[in-house]
A protein has these predicted regions:
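Conserved pre-motif I regulatory segment
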Residues: 13-51
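Walker A/P-loop
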Residues: 45-65
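Conserved helicase ATPase core of P-loop NTP-dependent helicases/translocases
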Residues: 302-304, 312-313, 319-355
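Conserved P-loop NTPase motor "coupling/switch" region that bridges the ATPase
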Residues: 74-76, 95, 131, 139, ...
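A short beta-strand element within the Helicase C-terminal
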Residues: 128-133, 175-178, 359-372, 395-399
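A conserved SF2-helicase RecA2
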Residues: 374-462
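Conserved interdomain hinge at the start of the Helicase C-terminal
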Residues: 273, 278-306
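Conserved Walker A/P-loop ATP-binding site and its immediately adjacent core
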Residues: 59-64, 73-95, 170-175, 307-308
């Protein structure tokens, strides 16, 4: 009979190391020293995550990772990016001297670096790639979604994997679980069972076990680098000091007799009620946004909205504005976003779900949120399109809401504080990562060491 200890030992799985060393002189000359160190660490690991504040140069790091893997293995590497970001990644590749191509199907794949978007993944064979890079990988946060399952299954045998995104959402441990499962380090279920306690019946309510918090963040630091600025790793912060962020809330009143109006006096509580309140104040909010922009008509503005009706009315109210909708053809979206990035479009009206991830708009320093969803991450990402390293001017963020929506600004600031605390915890342990020489990645399985002998009932013992 197999001993129980041997049985448990047999359940442990340590995948083979797939990382390799790269000398700094062999890396792209346009990279900063700290970018080289992080990328070398990721290549040694083979499978890693880069959670970096916007503007730290994740693009050149992921391009270097992909290029080094492709050269070493002699096989193509795939970079997967949001629909509106792929063309920008290609331009960055060309600027830094990488050979890369945009691909829509497997037939388009060329040796070296290939770039596609998440919507095209079903047209590719994951087994043909030596490595995969997920850009803006927070798309995995939809942990019950088809996309998450497709990505994890498609690349489960891919030797080299890199996940790149901004720092995770506040207390969104499910997102970390998805990241670690994509990397093949530990399943999300194992992570939750090891480090977390489930609160109540809501499947999303997980909290860290008190005694496991330090161990959890130490474990995260074995596969993820978390960076708010180069100074987190002891490098100079020259050029990486952000200008002021000015956030102003504008509260409009609705005098329509609606239950969410000035005379109705109710505060929306549920998601449905908040959406109803936004519809009730639609015209007032859009007109307020137009008035704000009219005060500085010669500067560029981004108008973020949540509803199609908001997008349509904003375009009507604001001169020289252009709307980018989800139903637009990919080429039309790309054209409008590039024109805005190059300064040829004065006012862009769109949703965070369309253009809130990955775009670099440091040339613009004014934005308005005319409609907000309940996603903190979407707002965080949308603000970071302009408020990122490389921005030279103070960034002005205007939030236009109705009185029925409550104190939106205070809620945003509360979540921002939560995010800052989470980043600080992760950075605290990540600081030492680059001083270690760790190769590959081990699948973490916590050994079970029973202190009390198991009593087996007589009726389950075979004669």
């Amino acid at each position: 009979m197999v001993k129980y200890e041997d049985f448990l030992a047999g359940k442990q799985h340590i995948p083979p190391s797939c990382g390799f060393e790269v000398d700094k002189p062999a890396m792209n000359i346009h990279m900063f020293e700290w970018q080289k160190d992080i990328t070398r660490w990721a290549l040694r690991k083979g499978r890693a995550a880069l959670f970096e504040e916007c503007g730290n140069g994740k693009t050149i790091q992921q391009l270097e990772f992909a290029d080094q893997v492709a050269k070493r293995e002699g096989r193509p590497v795939l970079i997967v990016a949001p629909l509106t970001v792929g063309a920008q990644t290609l331009r960055e590749a060309q600027k830094f001297g990488y050979s890369a191509a945009i691909c829509r199907t497997q037939a388009d794949v060329t040796p070296g670096i290939n770039i596609t978007n998440y919507e095209m993944l079903q047209h590719f064979d994951g087994r043909s790639f030596a490595g995969v890079v997920l850009d803006e990988s927070s798309i995995l946060k939809n942990y019950t979604g088809k996309m998450r399952n497709q990505i994890i299954e498609m690349f489960k045998d891919t030797p080299y994997r890199l996940s790149c995104t901004a720092t995770p959402s506040p207390n969104d441990y499910m997102e970390l679980g998805n990241q670690v499962e994509f990397l093949g380090i530990m399943s999300r279920t194992e992570m939750l069972a090891t480090y977390f306690i489930h609160d109540g019946s809501d499947t999303s309510k997980w909290r860290l076990k008190g005694h496991a918090e330090d161990r959890f963040w130490e474990w995260v630091s074995t596969w993820a680098v978390v960076l708010t600025c180069p100074g987190d790793l002891g490098y100079p912060n020259d050029g990486y000091i952000l200008p002021p962020l000015n956030m102003t809330e504008h509260i409009v009143e609705v005098e329509s007799g609606d239950k969410y109006s000035l005379f109705g006096g109710e505060i929306a509580k549920t998601l449905t009620e908040r959406r109803d309140a936004r519809r009730a104040s639609l015209r007032e909010r859009c007109e307020q946004a137009a008035e704000i922009i009219a005060q500085n008509p010669d500067e560029q503005w981004v108008c973020w909205c949540d509803l199609n009706a908001e997008s349509e009315l904003l375009t009507e109210c604001i001169p020289n504005s252009e709307e980018v909708r989800g139903s637009d053809k990919p080429e039309a979206k790309e054209d409008a976003l590039i024109r805005f990035a190059n300064g040829y479009l004065s006012v862009l009206v769109t949703k965070p779900s369309i253009a809130g991830f990955g775009m670099n708009w440091q040339q613009c320093h004014n934005m308005i949120f005319v409609g907000l969803s309940d996603s903190y991450e979407q707002m965080y990402q949308a603000i970071r399109r302009c408020y990122r390293f490389g921005q030279k001017r103070p960034v002005n963020v205007h939030i236009v809401t109705s009185a029925a929506e409550g104190d939106v600004k205070a809620n945003v600031e509360r979540k921002e504080q939560q995010a800052a605390e989470m980043k600080q915890n992760m950075v605290q342990y990540t600081k030492e990562i680059l001083r270690k020489d760790i190769r590959g990645q081990e699948r973490i399985v916590i050994p079970y060491d029973p202190q009390i002998a198991m009593i087996v009932p007589d009726w389950v013992i075979s004669e």
